[in-house]
Amino acid sequence: MKPLTPRQAEVLELIKVNMSETGMPPTRAEIAQKLGFKSANAAEEHLKALAKKGVIEIMPGTSRGIRLLIEEEAVLEETGLPLIGKVAAGEPILAQEHIESHYQVDPALFHPRADFLLRVQGMSMKNIGILDGDLLAVHKTQEVRNGQVVVARLDEDVTVKRFQRKGSQVWLLPENEELEPIAVDLSCQQLTIEGLAVGVIRNADWM
């Protein structure tokens, strides 16, 4: 794709957002109104420029005749949330090779805003409704407080547990009375907090 001007990028982003939220592209008048153009004709000129660069196709005869030509996956990558698969030791959790797919889920549905999804494995957090196969929405941060549910990496394992720390001692607490807490001594073990759990997308098999 040829480089876009800042204004063209704004128009393209508006088209993507409108299609994501409503299922339809915006009209020329809507583009003009939302981006502050003086007229729908100004919006039309930007659309023609995007078409010339191979980003969209203009369909004649309809006010919403705009079709995205960029790959659907590219749209998902920009508007959805990545699903993280198996994580290699020593690699950033959001490294491209860890991303299995993208889900068309609005990150702003969660507070704080979600940065990625992680598929839950096992029933260690079942007492608070986080079940095997669920998708856990995660806000990427290393700043967490005692009592919060976190995504932590210990050696090569990524786990979801409730966080508790006192000095150099950390306990990763399950929400399942059949399992024992994981004790971590930060003076001799490396623990990485990958993020804070901010929501759950239920596995349909449980419903």
From Swiss-Prot:
Gene name of the record: lexA
One GO-annotated biological process of the protein: DNA repair
Species this chain originates from: Aeromonas salmonicida (strain A449)
Catalytic activity as recorded in UniProt: Hydrolysis of Ala-|-Gly bond in repressor LexA
Marked site (Cleavage) residue numbers: A89, G90
Organism superkingdom: Bacteria
Keyword Hydrolase: yes
Keywords from the UniProt entry: Autocatalytic cleavage, DNA damage, DNA repair, DNA replication, DNA-binding, Hydrolase, Repressor, SOS response, Transcription, Transcription regulation
Function: Represses a number of genes involved in the response to DNA damage (SOS response), including recA and lexA. In the presence of single-stranded DNA, RecA interacts with LexA causing an autocatalytic cleavage which disrupts the DNA-binding part of LexA, leading to derepression of the SOS regulon and eventually DNA repair.
Gene3D superfamilies, per the entry: Umud Fragment, subunit A (2.10.109.10), Winged helix-like DNA-binding domain superfamily/Winged helix DNA-binding domain (1.10.10.10)
Subunit note: Homodimer.
Active-site annotation: S124 (for autocatalytic cleavage activity), K161 (for autocatalytic cleavage activity)
Stated family: Belongs to the peptidase S24 family.
SUPFAM superfamilies linked to this entry: LexA/Signal peptidase (SSF51306), Winged helix' DNA-binding domain (SSF46785)
Alphabetical list of NCBIfam families matching this protein: lexA (TIGR00498)
A GO MF label: serine-type endopeptidase activity
EC nos: 3.4.21.88
Identification of the protein by name: LexA repressor
Annotated region of DNA binding: 28-48
Segments traversing the membrane: none
